[in-house]
Amino acid sequence: MAVPDWKHAADVVVIGTGVAGLAAALAAHRAGRNVVVLTKADQRRGETATHYAQGGIAVVLPGSDDSVDAHASDTLAAGAGMCNLDTVYSIVAEGYHAVTELVGYGARFDESIPGRWAVTCEGGHSRRRIVHAGGDATGAEVQRALDHAADVLDIRTSHLALRVLHDGTVVNGVSVLNPNGWGIVSAPSVILASGGLGHLYGATTNPEGSTGDGIALALWAGVAVSDLEFIQFHPTMLFAAGTGTGGRRPLVTEAIRGEGAILLDSKGNSVTSGVHPLGDLAPRDVVAAAIDARLKATGDSCVYLDARGIDGFASRFPTVTAACRTVGIDPAREPIPVVPGAHYSCGGIVTDAYGQTELAGLFAAGEVARTGMHGANRLASNSLLEGLVVGGRAGRAAAAHAAAAGRAYVSKLEPVTHHALKRRELQRVMSRDAAVMRNAAGLQRLSDTLAEAPIRHVTGRRDFEDVALTLTARAVAAAALARNESRGCHHCTEYPDTAPEHARSTVIRLADDQNLVRAEALATVG
């Protein structure tokens, strides 16, 4: 075992500073544990997916015409038979408490009248239950409030988590790279809240750090991941000619359709007419697939979101308005050009509803986790809800585990040979073979390409991210190849129908040689 350049000890290590990470860290801190938060970002308040979330938080408000049953029913319908019923009800029922706790941190939501939150509707919801802030800047307000509350925490910037350390039975820390070199943070509890994997693709709504790090860390630790074939492509990502082939692109929030905007093709025809009873407000997987099919049929580069009928658009949706104006579009006068874009991973590290994985002391929360909340397709505005609820639960559970486990000791760190494709090449083959529509031949071609990735020596963040992306891509391809049907976010041209016998999750693990990925039946966690 190499001698580390530095060492540190904590009770709980949290990796990530978005909604789930900070909710977890604050909960563990309130429980009296010594918490260290690691972020690979180079500034205290780094770029997170939470910050860019526009729509809002889906929550059942007391005294409304809504109910936990109704919200759960909508979530289950969107999840296409793949949600965990108990998890869904558990998280939805705790939503209002989690949001009021966020208000206690200083978050302020838009009001319809003084003292009453304004609510809107989004795709797949049967009620107006989406609370929002700043019109379409909810995520920024959630992040602001959590960042303010997190001033009490020990947050380490430019700290890249390389491996979760364990003895095969329990966690004992994290291997980390920072500007001072390679080091170890020993801890009996580790919480992965590192976000998503959008940069598997050339165009995504995700921030630059969404490179599948948590999925790779879990696989290297021998922990199961599941449902990775269900990658949600948001139907409406802003399209502008000449914006390049890669990187983050602005989201055009679903709430705009909730307020009456309609999707049209270049000839003025409805994109979703006859596709789903909810039309433009159908679940995201349905709308994204409809747009993708229309673009393939017409050869057009984009479809259009016509929001000209919405009064006061600029004040209701200032974030979208600003993004549109940046590329010379005035939403009040012309339709907004949009395309589907990689947005959210419905699957992830297998956990229970409290963030516990199969490895004692390892927890996961937020987009990186697969709790069973989202199934095959996430319902709009359920992500911030899950991050708040499960993040808080994971923090409390990690604190309790740390108190019971006592001090952690790192025994040894086995060397690992890493492989990675170049980022642009990886994104090209993923966008070609594992995007909105897939087929078996393309997925096999993708798997073969990924298997031939050359050795990459990790000397910094970019190398590590490419390694993590490549391993995550292999897991996505393996999961997609194992699903011989179309369901939720997974659309397979050879199998266009949903097969009841396939209403089960596919688990992916790393083989003992740390090289091959295999699929197996899902085992119950917790």
From Swiss-Prot:
Pfam families: FAD_binding_2 (PF00890), Succ_DH_flav_C (PF02910). This is L-aspartate oxidase. FAD binds at residues 17-20, 40, 49-56, 213, 367, 383-384. One of its GO terms (cellular component) is cytoplasm. Belongs to the FAD-dependent oxidoreductase 2 family. NadB subfamily. The record marks E122 as: Important in orienting the L-aspartate substrate. It is found in: Cytoplasm. Binds 1 FAD per subunit. Its EC number is 1.4.3.16. The gene is nadB. GO terms for molecular function: L-aspartate oxidase activity; nucleotide binding; steroid dehydrogenase activity, acting on the CH-CH group of donors.
